[in-house]
Curated annotation (Swiss-Prot):
The modification Phosphothreonine is found at residues 178, 327-328. It comes from Homo sapiens (Human). The gene is STK26. Gene3D superfamilies: 1.10.12.70, Phosphorylase Kinase, domain 1, Transferase(Phosphotransferase) domain 1. This is Serine/threonine-protein kinase 26. The active site is at residue 144. GO terms for molecular function: ATP binding; identical protein binding; magnesium ion binding; protein homodimerization activity; protein kinase activity; protein serine kinase activity; protein serine/threonine kinase activity. Interaction with Golgi matrix protein GOLGA2 leads to autophosphorylation on Thr-178, possibly as a consequence of stabilization of dimer formation. May also be activated by C-terminal cleavage. Keywords: Acetylation, Apoptosis, ATP-binding, Cytoplasm, Golgi apparatus, Kinase, Magnesium, Metal-binding, Nucleotide-binding, Phosphoprotein, Serine/threonine-protein kinase, Transferase. GO terms for biological process: apoptotic process; cellular response to oxidative stress; cellular response to starvation; intracellular signal transduction; microvillus assembly; negative regulation of cell migration; protein autophosphorylation; protein phosphorylation. Changing residue 36 to W: In a gastric adenocarcinoma sample; somatic mutation.
Length: 416
């Protein structure tokens, strides 16, 4: 369904007469966010430093519901552990989203200069847990916890960001069953499209803890599609290496395949690893200073993506599998079920044609680029699937889901 940019409404939308280019001074670009470019800026009225996310709604037409969702969630949050949202302005087809500026970068940025020690990890995890405890108390699920979505201020304050796939639980709907998130960090029950709740964030936190310790999540050397098969089938990842027993136990607690046995965020704040090792957030400024030194030494070739994580220009997904841009998997909502930017009834849909089938065919054709007859057969098969999808929207999703179920069943039958 097409959307006219002028018809877009989001919480905190300012009077359309107000010109954001007069109210704010746009400075250097600091990254590419979930749906557009992000700039450092100055509020000319207060001289406050802000982050300005600018989205061309004509180009981001398919993502408008996700943009509304992110702004809706942020506008409802009032926590020092969640990125603050100040308001939005519409100028032509450009939506200006004004947010809190966090100049310390993302945890993923800081990891580029090297892994963290356990005191730094415990300190960062404690702040993430405070953010999750707040969100879960508000019946919200982040659904995309990872180092790229954890931002720091220059003083070391830690905040959760990127709420484009966040979900809202109601009193009558205590679990969700929508396939969203990022494969490497995704909980088994989310991949299987089973009913899930805030405990899915706890699994992602456990994977993030490993990421902070090792510099990357488990299975990062594998194809993301294979990871989707393996996470529900295999035993949970464990932290291997010279780490303390309490840290390994913290991760094991988060990565229980049965969500009912995972602790809550509030319970994890009392875990021995957090209590004994966490320090004041100012302790994290050493990581920020280290990253600045690392960049000054000429190690950084890519632009930092501190204020948004979808492109993750330095991430292992894009480096290892250039044909796949497999970061955050986002839902495709039914516009009829979106009211005031909040999706009331999420559709259980994975965009398999664009996320899985098309990239898979591209890889097959690349592998057999010198075999004309094989490539022609691949193209014919790809066209047939596209025709079937056009005639019966959603049929590809059902087919891939069924293939995953069959694969998992066969794998389980073959297991000793």
């Amino acid at each position: 369904m097409a959307h006219s940019p002028v018809a877009v409404q989001v919480p905190g939308m300012q009077n359309n007469i107000a010109d954001p280019e007069e109210l704010f001074t746009k400075l250097e670009r600091i990254g590419k966010g979930s749906f557009g470019e992000v700039f450092k800026g100055i509020d000319n009225r207060t001289q406050q430093v802000v982050a300005i996310k600018i989205i061309d709604l004509e180009e981001a037409e398919d993502e408008i519901e996700d943009i509304q969702q992110e702004i809706t969630v942020l506008s409802q949050c009032d926590s020092s552990y969640v990125t603050k949202y100040y308001g939005s302005y519409l100028k032509g087809s450009k939506l200006w989203i004004i947010m809190e500026y966090l100049g310390g970068g993302s945890a993923l940025d800081l990891l580029r200069a090297g892994p963290f020690d356990e005191f730094q990890i415990a300190t960062m995890l404690k702040e993430i847990l405070k953010g999750l405890d707040y969100l879960h108390s508000e019946k919200k699920i982040h659904r995309d916890i990872k180092a790229a979505n954890v931002l720091l201020s220059e003083q070391g304050d830690v905040k959760l960001a990127d709420f484009g796939v966040a979900g809202q639980l109601t009193d009558t709907q205590i679990k969700r069953n929508t396939f969203v998130g990022t494969p490497f960090w995704m909980a088994p029950e989310v991949i299987q499209q089973s009913a899930y709740d805030s405990k899915a964030d706890i699994w992602s936190l456990g994977i993030t803890a490993i990421e902070l310790a090792k510099g990357e999540p488990p299975n990062s050397d594998m194809h993301p599609m294979r990871v989707l098969f393996l996470i529900p089938k295999n035993n949970p990842p464990t932290l291997v290496g010279d780490f303390t027993k309490s840290f390994k136990e913290f991760i094991d607690a988060c990565l229980n395949k049965d969500p009912s046995f995972r602790p809550t965020a509030k319970e994890l704040l009392k875990h021995k690893f957090i209590v004994k090792n966490s320090k004041k957030t100012s302790y994290l400024t050493e990581l920020i200073d280290r990253f600045k030194r690392w960049k000054a030494e000429g190690h950084s070739d890519d632009e930092s993506d501190s204020e948004g994580s979808d492109s993750e220009s330095t991430s292992r997904e894009n480096n290892t599998h250039p044909e796949w841009s497999f970061t955050t998997v986002r839902k495709k909502p039914d516009p009829k079920k979106v009211q005031n930017g909040a999706e009331q009834d999420l559709v259980q849909t994975l965009s398999c044609l664009s996320m899985i089938i098309t990239p898979a065919f591209a890889e097959l054709k690349q592998q057999d680029e010198n075999n004309a007859s094989r490539n022609q057969a691949i193209e014919e098969l790809e066209k047939s699937i596209a025709v079937a999808e056009a005639a019966c929207p959603g049929i590809t999703d059902k087919m891939v889901k069924k293939l995953i179920e069959k694969f998992q069943k066969c794998s389980a039958d073959e297991s000793p």
